[in-house]
Amino acid sequence: ENFAGGCATGFLRTADGRCKPTF
């Protein structure tokens, strides 16, 4: 699965390009 941020499921891409968990 590829998302816009390239992060794993349950993670969001932040403005600085990192992935952070949404929980």
Swiss-Prot record:
Keywords: Cytokine, Disulfide bond. It holds the Pfam family GBP_PSP. Hemolymph. It comes from the Eukaryota. One of its GO terms (cellular component) is extracellular space. Causes rapid, rigid paralysis when injected into Lepidopteran larvae. The physiological role may be to reduce hemolymph loss following injury and promote wound healing. Disulfide bonds join 7-19. This is Paralytic peptide 2. It comes from Manduca sexta. Belongs to the GBP/PSP1/paralytic peptide family. Transmembrane segments: none annotated.
